[in-house]
Amino acid sequence: MPNPGFRPSRRKSLARRTHRISGLVLAGTLLALPGLAAAEDLRTYAVTGDAIPHSLTGVAGDVARGRALVVERSSTCILCHSGPFPEQKFQGDLAPDLAGSGSRWSEGQLRLRLVDASRLNAATIMPSYYRVDGLERVGALWRGKPILSAEQIEDIVAYLVTLRQ
């Protein structure tokens, strides 16, 4: 027995609206990722021991911009880390507290942890923020692009080295 309330045209309209909304949500999500660096020529760097001793940009990063990136949820730092950010109510507890980072690690060690943490620990859940090769399950829009730019890496390093106990 056919359903008397069934109207195919209404169903198609709902499907179209749902599809449009999904597209808008996806577009909004992509726009909300300011940390996603634009396609750029990746700067070369040398790893010495457990560090990248030299700046990726050749200049020191900006401490204020680095702090802003760390506490910004879309850059993902405070989703896993906690730290001296009293204005942030919800901080992560999956990774080390960032307080005292500048006492525990050198500038070069912090830089390598941001660029490619998996080089130090293959089982890490921390993303490689500046590595683009050898990664698995990378979305088509992100292939060949670092999560953070070299400048953003240097800004975050500049901030983290100020966190001393």
Please identify what each model-predicted range represents:
Residues 78, 82-116, 125-139:
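Gly/Gly-Pro-rich "capping" loops immediately C-terminal to redox-active cysteine motifs
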Residues 22-34:
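Bacterial N-terminal signal peptides
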Residues 1-17:
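N-terminal secretory signal peptides that target proteins for export/translocation
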Residues 41-72:
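Electrostatic cytochrome c docking/interface patches
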Residues 61, 65-68, 97, 105, ...:
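Extracytoplasmic/secreted proteins, especially bacterial periplasmic and envelope-associated proteins
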Residues 37-39:
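Boundary at the C-terminal end of the N-terminal hydrophobic targeting segment
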Residues 73-76, 152:
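Short pre-active-site segment immediately N-terminal to redox-active cysteine/selenocysteine motifs
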Residues 41, 108, 112-113, 119, ...:
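C-terminal capping alpha-helices of c-type cytochrome domains
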